[in-house]
Amino acid sequence: MVADAQVSESKTAVRRGRLVVLAGPSAVGKSSVVRLLRERMPELVFSVSATTRDPRPGEVDGKDYRFTSRDEFQRMIESGELLEWAEIHGGLQLSGTPAAPVRRAIEQGKPVLVEVDLAGARAVRAAMPEALLVFMAPPSWDVLVERLTGRGTESAEVVERRLATARVELEAQDEFDEVIVNEDVSRSCDELVSLLVGRPEQSESTH
């Protein structure tokens, strides 16, 4: 019994958590899916991105995003605190992923979700090749345009920039390991849960 317990403890110690990187166009519904995912998977570690944009209604600093100034963001870049970072929508804002919480959670064997843009997904893949890249796509282009313009929270210029960015992102979805078409929030959430916990390491499952 003691030997079995020691073997089990050893396996737990060496198992690394799964890192899933989620990207997709603005207004594709990522936030709604992630919100439901966090309710269904309380053990999930969700990487809180640092961003220089202003909070949207209902967003909480430190929970939804780490809202920061450009000066503070620049300091984080220079001190190597970010796993990835990028200029978003033609330089309107800066966004990045603090590295320490992600690496710590993976070493502890926890499932980790990082939500980034296309450039961020590429950067995480370069830094952590074991990451599983997941692209969330809209049912159609028309649906995406309707969702984005229906927000009513951004100027026409910002909307046009977001649409231009979305075209580039949609053209790059073949770079991702998995594609989820977000027609239904609950179903998309189920697919993410499966990707986060449904593929145990073969080396461990066969022993």
UniProtKB/Swiss-Prot annotation:
The keyword Kinase applies. Its main location: cytoplasm. One of its GO terms (cellular component) is cytosol. GO terms for molecular function: ATP binding; guanylate kinase activity. It holds the Pfam family Guanylate_kin. The keyword Ligase does not apply. Its EC number is 2.7.4.8. It comes from the Bacteria. It catalyses: GMP + ATP = GDP + ADP. Keywords: ATP-binding, Cytoplasm, Kinase, Nucleotide-binding, Transferase. It is found in: Cytoplasm. ATP binds at G24, P25, S26, A27, V28, G29, K30, S31. Residues 17-197 form the Guanylate kinase-like domain. Belongs to the guanylate kinase family. Essential for recycling GMP and indirectly, cGMP. This is Guanylate kinase.
